[in-house]
Curated annotation (Swiss-Prot):
The lineage of its organism: Bacteria, Pseudomonadati, Pseudomonadota, Alphaproteobacteria, Rickettsiales. One of its GO terms (molecular function) is NADH dehydrogenase (ubiquinone) activity. Its cofactor is [4Fe-4S] cluster. Disulfide bonds: none annotated. It comes from the Bacteria. It is a peripheral membrane protein. NDH-1 shuttles electrons from NADH, via FMN and iron-sulfur (Fe-S) centers, to quinones in the respiratory chain. Couples the redox reaction to proton translocation (for every two electrons transferred, four hydrogen ions are translocated across the cytoplasmic membrane), and thus conserves the redox energy in a proton gradient. This is NADH-quinone oxidoreductase subunit B. [4Fe-4S] cluster binds at residues 45-46, 110, 140. Its EC number is 7.1.1.-. Keywords: 4Fe-4S, Cell inner membrane, Cell membrane, Iron, Iron-sulfur, Membrane, Metal-binding, NAD, Quinone, Translocase, Transport, Ubiquinone.
Amino acid sequence: MGNGFSDVNALSNVSSDGYLVAKLDDLINWARSGSLWPMTFGLACCAVEMMHFTASRYDMDRFGMIFRPSPRQSDVMIVAGTLTNKMAPALRRVYDQMAEPKYVISMGSCANGGGYYHYSYSVVRGCDRIVPVDVYVPGCPPTAEALLYGVLCLQKKINRQRNFIRR
């Protein structure tokens, strides 16, 4: 169930008969959810917790996540911190350069809705006004466990997607 395959009986066929029967959608979603390559967009103190997520205690590599330096190589953007009006066009430009399918994780109160600086004239009140957000991770700053839970929620969301139109 956690790997994206919904039929437990199909997994028993692998051990007894040596083959697996699955839908192509399930296989594609399983591969996509197991190889997320995030692009960091660390803007403030939430980026420190994002660094904790990469360290040995949480080890994001075991979930197939490897930070990529270029938006053209990544399919997940983690927006962490206060997004200002001046930085918003850069965020949109980086998002537009990402490969399809692309996902966005909004990390922290500032990225989710402006946070502590919500009433400031120069702060965007949520990065979802600039880019579509798939997962919101609450907290100020959110812990590495919260980001891990957000990544697991994104993997579940990817596993529920339909890639092909059935007629």
